[in-house]
A protein has these predicted regions:
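Aromatic/hydrophobic pocket-lining residues that form the small-molecule binding cavity
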Residues: 41-45, 74, 105, 144, ...
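Acidic (Asp/Glu)-rich catalytic clusters
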Residues: 48-54, 78-85, 107-117, 149-153, ...
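Core AdoMet radical
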Residues: 9, 29-41, 53-71, 84-103, ...
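Radical SAM enzyme [4Fe-4S]-AdoMet core and its adjacent flexible, acidic
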Residues: 28, 34-36, 125, 133, ...
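Short, acidic/polar
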Residues: 45, 101-111, 170-176
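Accessory C-terminal segments flanking Radical SAM cores
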Residues: 223-324, 336
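Active-site-adjacent beta->alpha loops and helix N-cap segments on the catalytic face
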Residues: 71-77
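N-terminal pre-triad scaffold of radical SAM enzymes
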Residues: 1-28, 49, 53-64, 248-253
Length: 336
């Protein structure tokens, strides 16, 4: 077992609703925020950040909110994030925000510019009809284009990401061109993860042969060092090189009372212990691959997702009942 060091701690409060219902939502958004009241969360975060920066020098500590950036008092929220030293005080993921017309989009972007936002990111699931179905909201595609146009006018740079599957791969070339024309600084292709509702996309996970539908330009936007076929990963000597750990503290209505009575470091140590218990319950990747791997498998994965896929199969076969540290709606961890 490799030595794991906690290198970052993120505190989150999932108290802000998302206006989409995306098919692969990492946070399995179901219309009901799990976080605690905003002000209560900020007070606790301020104490935790102060304690953790003193106790864990050299460990990066940050604060964020979700499910979307559609905070009812977004300007004040951004000022709070800046005061707490959060990276999201300069970068926003602009998915799942409320419907706005062109004028309202301009007002939003002008406010973001004034508050020091330097970069935005948009996730686009396909061309208009497909995107709207995938996002679970009619008009979402057009909203993203309005927001991109307003960001461009306000002088805020933005990037775009396209999660590609068997369903939308043949739309990708056209979509890449549209996003670049809209002013996207970069366009990245990625394979959806297996976590949250991502596991429901397994039947349409991209395979190596599907890449022939992409132009050379679009194909170059998918990092094939990160995304490889199962066969390619299994041919690597030791593909899982996990030495770093991020601890996630999620302030929720079902834990905030307890967290308020405890020191930040005691909560972090509790989650670190849960992380160790979770990962020690499984054989290593090589053993899991012997049991569940397909040496000829052509589906594309990040190694993290393939590892997660094997662990899920092992847990089901052995009826494991573990605290799921990979569920990002609750306090947990992520290794890399």
């Amino acid at each position: 077992m490799k030595a794991i060091q906690t290198q970052s701690i993120m505190i989150q409060n999932l108290c802000v609703p998302c206006f989409n219902r995306c098919r692969y939502c990492l946070l399995s958004w179901d219309g009901k925020p799990v976080g605690t009241a905003w002000e209560r969360g900020v007070v606790l975060a301020e104490r935790y950040i102060s304690e953790l920066r003193a106790a864990r020098r050299g460990v990066n500590v940050s604060y964020a909110f979700g499910y979307s950036m559609e905070h009812p008092e977004l300007r004040k929220a951004l000022q709070t994030l800046r005061r707490l030293g959060s990276p999201t005080a300069e970068f926003l993921q602009c998915d799942g925000m409320a419907m706005r017309d062109e004028g309202q989009c301009r007002e939003l972007m002008q406010m973001l510019k004034a508050e020091g936002i330097k970069n935005l990111n948009f996730t686009v699931y396909g061309l208009k009809d497909y995107h709207d179905r995938f996002a679970g909201r009619i008009g979402d595609y057009d909203l993203l284009l309005r927001m991109m146009n307003a960001a461009d006018q306000a002088g805020i740079s933005f990037d775009s990401g396209i999660p590609i599957t068997k369903e939308n791969v043949r739309q990708t070339d056209e979509l890449v061109g549209l996003l670049k024309h809209a002013g996207s600084r970069s366009v990245t292709l990625f394979i959806p993860h297996e976590e949250g509702r991502g596991k429901t996309l397994n039947p349409i996970r991209l395979e190596q042969d599907d890449l022939t539908a992409l132009s050379p330009e679009s194909s170059g936007l998918l990092n094939r060092t990160i995304y490889r076929t199962e066969s390619e990963w299994l041919s690597c000597a030791d593909p899982v090189q996990e030495t770093k750990r991020m601890i996630l503290l999620s302030f929720r209505s079902d834990n905030v009372d307890r967290y308020e009575t405890r020191s930040a470091i005691s909560v972090v140590e509790e989650i670190e212990a849960l992380d160790e218990a979770y990962h020690s319950a499984f054989p290593d990747f090589a053993e899991l691959a012997k049991e569940y791997g397909d040496a000829a498998g052509k589906r594309l994965y990040r190694i993290r997702d393939l590892h997660h896929h094997y662990r899920a199969l092992f847990a089901a076969d052995h009826n494991l009942e573990l605290y799921d540290v990979t569920d990002e709606r609750q306090s947990g961890s992520r290794r890399s």
